[in-house]
Design a protein with these regions (language model features):
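Beta-strand-rich interaction surfaces with strong enrichment in secreted/lumenal proteins
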Residues: 68-70, 138-140, 268-273
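Extended, loop-rich substrate-binding clefts of extracytoplasmic carbohydrate-active enzymes
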Residues: 1, 8-10, 81, 95-144
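A short, structured loop/turn motif at beta-sheet edges
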Residues: 71-77, 114-120, 142-147, 175-179, ...
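Active-site/ligand-binding surface loops and adjacent short beta/alpha elements
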Residues: 158-162, 169-239
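Acidic, contiguous internal or C-terminal segments within carbohydrate-active enzymes
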Residues: 125-169, 174
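Beta-strand-rich N-terminal accessory domains
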Residues: 1-89, 220-239, 276-289
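C-terminal structured interaction module
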Residues: 256-289
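Glycine-rich active-site loops that engage anionic ligands at enzyme catalytic sites
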Residues: 226-262
Length: 289
């Protein structure tokens, strides 16, 4: 492991690097939302570079929340939220993907380092405003010669609340200037029908061909393989049952394992309680050709 001062992002931020010598190098930026800024496998960078890219954690929700609002049947600390007509308390998150709120809050927060060694590291951040409930999110990285395992936990530090967790990696479409475009292979059980507002309608339909900006159900766990012909194969697995696949950008594709679908805080809420935290993990396993 090494740390290094960097002039990008937050002033004084330190990168954390995990190394499997001769095989892989992972760079994490704790003060920039605990984002992975680089994953190099056998001298090939596989993630799109830039402040918005790499791979970032999504919590306490994934994807879009309709109009930035969700309801909870637990009173928020400090009050001040409106009671909805259909019951519960309505909370308003900041709109950052008009007219919705997208991808959670922790990607915009600095994280603290808990433990670091040569090939693993753990970080955490506390849930704060605008999220109305006290809690903590923890993320662990474990690097080996042929795999990276990410684990994220969301825990309550007070009242119970609905939550989701997942990851949003931006994989390069081509590895190097002469590489062939990546191929995406997966076999979902269904596709969440997407409305004109980019939210699932609630209907499950037969999976269709790309290009995609869509959520898919994989009840036996996420299993998606990316293949860069003659260069690299990378398989993304997770016990999570939903994955968003986005391949509409020329430079990169996204495969996002997550614990629930977009707008899931409203449609399929998973309650985090003081005795029942949410935990999700994903493993990216690779082999060179």
């Amino acid at each position: 492991m090494s740390t290094q001062e960097t002039t990008e992002g937050a002033p004084g931020a330190r990168d954390v690097r995990l190394v499997a010598p001769g095989f892989a190098e992972l760079t994490i930026r704790p003060e920039d939302g605990c984002r992975i800024s680089s994953l190099i496998i056998n001298d090939l960078e596989v993630l799109r570079q830039g402040d918005r890219y790499g791979s970032f954690p999504m919590a306490p929700w994934c994807g879009r929340i309709e109009l930035g609002q969700f309801r909870s049947f637990v009173t928020a600390p400090g009050g001040g939220d409106e009671a909805g007509r259909s019951g519960g308390v309505r909370h308003q998150m900041p709109i950052n993907a008009t007219p919705h709120a997208i991808h959670g809050t922790v990607r915009d927060q600095p994280w603290r380092t808990a433990t670091v060694d040569d090939q693993s590291a753990t970080f955490y951040c506390d849930l704060t405003d605008p999220w109305p409930y006290r809690g903590r999110v923890t993320q662990t990285f474990e690097l080996t010669d042929d795999a990276l395992t990410l684990t994220m936990g969301v825990e309550s530090r007070g009242d119970s609340f609905p939550a989701q967790a997942g990851w949003h990696p931006w994989f390069l479409r081509q590895l190097g200037p002469t590489g062939a475009p990546v191929q995406i292979a997966f076999d979902p059980a269904w596709q969440e029908e997407r409305g004109v507002d980019h939210l699932p309608t609630g209907r499950r339909v037969e999976p269709g061909p790309g290009p995609w900006d869509d959520c898919f159900g994989m009840p036996d766990g996420v299993d998606v393989t990316l293949t860069w012909p003659t260069q690299l194969e990378l398989t993304i697995t997770s016990g999570a049952q939903w994955v968003v696949v986005y391949d509409e950008q020329e430079e990169a594709v996204c495969v996002e394992p997550q614990s629930g679908p977009p707008n899931g805080l409203n449609t399929v809420p998973r309650l985090v309680t003081p005795i029942d935290p949410l935990e999700v993990s994903t493993t990216w396993r690779w082999k060179r050709f």
